[in-house]
Curated annotation (Swiss-Prot):
This is B-cadherin. It is a single-pass type I membrane protein. Keywords: Calcium, Cell adhesion, Cell membrane, Cleavage on pair of basic residues, Glycoprotein, Membrane, Metal-binding, Repeat, Transmembrane, Transmembrane helix. The gene is K-CAM. One of its GO terms (biological process) is calcium-dependent cell-cell adhesion via plasma membrane cell adhesion molecules. The lineage of its organism: Eukaryota, Metazoa, Chordata, Craniata, Vertebrata. It comes from Gallus gallus (Chicken). It is found in: Cell membrane. Its main location: membrane. Residues 581-732 are cytoplasmic. Residues 1-6 form a propeptide. Residues 6-554 are extracellular. The keyword tRNA processing does not apply.
């Protein structure tokens, strides 16, 4: 193969953007040396020809003139890559495709553009000249490599406010970096500067644009906080910890709620004992002075505190530290008596006699100048065992002590004593007494469990555990024996360890429930008899099952009998209560005893030999006034008048007397009341009256010995009876 020499002739192509035409406009003529040998046809392909954007470039097929059909925009496409082709009349290529690069040359048709409309930055107040503040930035779409069309220069057009100097800042014309050029930045004077920035292409000589640069002057701690006021006075009661004493206010010209403004307080003098603390209120920035512990009026009555204040941030310059003076007066209050020691330990035997002194526990009153009297009382005595003398604090045994009581823990009984002074108001101090009870041998050994099940033939011994609530040496080793005749059928033996006992049958017994009396002895000979409930089963060896004999369940009848007895007792108590309440009401008698004949029955004419019914119950004649029968008399027309209203019988027994008086008065004034052809009972005393029956009255043929003058004194209701028997003559 032999390399073929390239015969294309393609000069470089540069096309200015934004040309005015006319279009199409010739750019360059493409020629092949083969055109002398044969007729050549030319064509182009690529971007701008047959690829988007299509139709920008064309070529004359026979002459090879390449043309542009419209204005170009370098900012849109700055270079076009195309390929030229040469073919013969029969369509065969006569040249290799050749690359064509069309370069669009720039024109200054775009002005610079800032990347932001407003740039924001900050610089601390007091910054020295040369301190960098911020950077502004602008871009230009034009070419900044081959031309100056895209080369931007920055400048400051104006500054607001124009103090303390009209040119406080400068800008690097090439980079856009802003920096301080003059001293005197003071946030308390000017908090913010606004600069008008300009960007110009052609290195400052071309198109321009503007933007704003806002520079905030940040605060530094160049102002010391000051107390306002500088002197404080306060009073606090003694013995009050964490009590607010005073609030100290400060002023600071620095930016609020910044480290340069937030205050830090300290007590620099007068707080040698650490009685006070001071903190900063984060909301108000005030210094809050509090008591760290309770003050003692008797020890010190006044404090003079010196308080200093600084900021969280250190001072940017050398500044003096402000101080304030706080005078705190301590107010005297009635302090509670103080037990010494606050926890008293004592040891006593648990069997001390009642009234025996156990310990003396006293308190001292801190208010010595007041010479108050102290009274001692028990504050907490869970078991109620102790008593304390109100004047000298001597503690004695009120009840029998018991080391084994559930109120003790590890043989120690805790009680709380109170010491109350006679101040206004009284103050109470507390002291704790820990009373260690020394063990005595007051409990005998006990077996567990107390219910066993055993076979009556070849039984397996039942092993019981021995417990003793006392402490050594008042415990084991233990001894055991049977009592109350239990040894006739049972045997017992203490185990090798000394804390168990074995119980078994020595002769067969019928299946039943038995009581075995087991006596256990401790080392000191203290004994106790315990009843073991032994269920003997009809079996051999170890109990597998024990069928119980049927028995009559008497639980329900017993419960019913108990309920009946309780109800009967309640009924008796209720009757006794009613009787007592009746007797408490004392009423005047309705009639004098000598005039009261209601308990006597007189005979007013006998026409036969006596009553036919000798056992008539007089109670059947009794009816209340509210249930009396209607009586109709045929021989006399009843008067047309309203019947009286009778009061209903009250439920309260205490009002029975008033009930009788009111209804008797209503009956006496009732013109419709008897005597008619009816029978009334004026008083009935029950079955216990002297005249149990009307048959007890002897019949008489004459009533000459009777005096009926007293009937005139009985009122309107007996007027008719008095007329009948008052002045008539006896019939023969």
């Amino acid at each position: 193969l032999r390399r073929q020499k390239r015969d294309w002739v393609i000069p470089p192509i540069k096309v200015p953007e934004n040309e005015r035409g006319p279009f199409p406009k010739n750019l360059v003529q493409i020629k092949s040396n083969r055109d002398r040998e044969a007729k050549i046809f030319y064509s182009i392909t690529g971007q701008g020809a047959d690829a988007p954007p299509e139709g920008i470039f064309t070529i004359e097929k026979e002459t090879g003139w390449m043309k542009v059909t419209q204005p170009l925009d370098r900012e849109h496409i700055n270079k076009y890559h195309l390929y030229s082709h040469a073919v013969s009349e029969n369509g065969k290529p006569v040249e290799e495709p050749m690359e064509i690069i069309v370069t669009v040359t720039d024109q200054n048709d775009n002005k610079p553009q800032f990347t932001q409309e407003v740039f924001r930055g900050s610089v601390p107040e007091g910054a020295l000249p040369g301190t960098s503040v911020m950077r502004v930035n602008a871009t230009d779409a034009d070419d900044d490599v081959e031309t100056y069309n895209g080369v931007i220069a920055y400048s400051i057009l104006s500054q607001e406010p124009r103090e303390p100097h009209p040119h406080m800042f400068t800008v690097n014309r090439a980079t856009g970096t802003l920096s301080v050029i003059a001293s005197g930045l003071d946030r308390e004077r000017v908090r913010e500067y606004t600069l008008t920035m300009q960007a110009a292409d052609l290195d400052g000589q071309g198109l321009t644009t503007t933007a704003l640069a806002v520079i905030e002057i940040t605060d530094v701690n160049d102002n010391a906080p000051e107390f306002d006021p500088k002197t404080y006075e306060a009073a606090v009661p003694e013995n009050e910890a964490e009590l607010e004493v005073a609030r100290l206010a400060t002023t600071d010209l620095d930016e609020p709620h910044t480290p340069a403004w937030r205050a830090v307080y300290s007590i620099v003098r007068g707080n040698e004992g650490g009685a006070f603390t001071i903190t900063t209120d984060p909301a108000s920035n005030e210094g809050v002075l509090r008591t760290a512990k309770g003050l003692d009026y008797e020890a010190k009555r006044q404090f003079v505190l010196h308080v200093a204040v600084v900021n969280e941030a250190p001072f940017a310059i050398k500044l003096p530290t402000a101080t304030a003076t706080v005078m705190v007066s301590v107010e005297d209050v009635n302090e509670a008596p103080v037990f010494d020691p606050p926890l008293r330990l004592a040891q006593v035997p648990e069997d001390v006699p009642l009234g025996q002194p156990l310990a003396s526990y006293t308190a001292q009153d801190p208010d010595r100048a007041q010479q108050q009297r102290i009274k001692y009382v028990m504050g907490s005595d869970p078991a109620g065992w102790l008593a304390v003398h109100p004047e000298n604090g001597l503690i004695t045994a009120r009840e029998q002590l018991d080391r084994e009581s559930p109120f003790t823990k590890n043989s120690t009984y805790m009680a709380v004593l109170l010491a109350v002074d006679d101040g206004l108001p009284p103050a109470t101090g507390t002291g704790t007494l820990l009373l260690t009870l020394l063990d005595v041998n007051d409990h005998g050994p006990e077996p567990e469990p107390r219910d066993i099940v055993i076979c009556n033939r070849s039984p397996v011994p039942q092993v019981l555990t021995i417990t003793d609530r006392d402490l050594p040496p008042n415990t084991g080793p233990f001894r055991a024996e049977l009592s109350h005749g239990s040894g006739d059928s049972w045997a017992v033996e203490v185990g090798n360890g000394g804390d168990t006992v074995a119980l078994w049958l020595t002769e067969p017994l019928e299946q039943n429930l038995y009581s075995v009396y087991l006596r256990l002895f401790d080392r000191q000979g203290k004994d106790q008899v315990t009843v073991i409930r032994a269920q003997v089963c009809d079996c051999q060896g170890r109990v597998e099952s024990c069928a119980q004999k049927p028995r009559v369940d008497t639980g329900v009848p017993i419960v019913l009998a108990v309920l009946g007895a309780v109800l009967a007792l309640l009924l008796v108590l209720l009757l006794l209560l009613l009787l007592v309440r009746r007797r408490k009401v004392v009423k005047e008698p309705l009639l004098l005893p000598e005039d009261d004949t209601r308990d006597n029955i007189f005979y007013y004419g006998e026409e036969g030999g006596g009553e036919e019914d000798q056992d008539y119950d007089l109670s059947q004649l009794h009816r209340g006034l509210d249930a009396r029968p209607e009586v109709i008399r045929n021989d006399v027309a009843p008067p047309l008048m309203a019947a009286p209203q009778y009061r209903p019988r009250p439920a309260n027994p205490d009002e029975i007397g008033n009930f009788i008086d009111e209804n008797l008065k209503a009956a006496d004034t009732d013109p419709t009341a008897p005597p008619y052809d009816s029978l009334l009972v004026f008083d009935y005393e029950g079955g216990g009256s002297e005249a149990t029956s009307l048959s007890s009255l002897n019949s008489s043929a004459s009533d000459q010995d009777q005096d009926y003058d007293y009937l005139n004194e009985w009122g309107n209701r007996f007027k008719k009876l008095a007329e009948l028997y008052g002045g008539g003559e006896d019939e023969e």
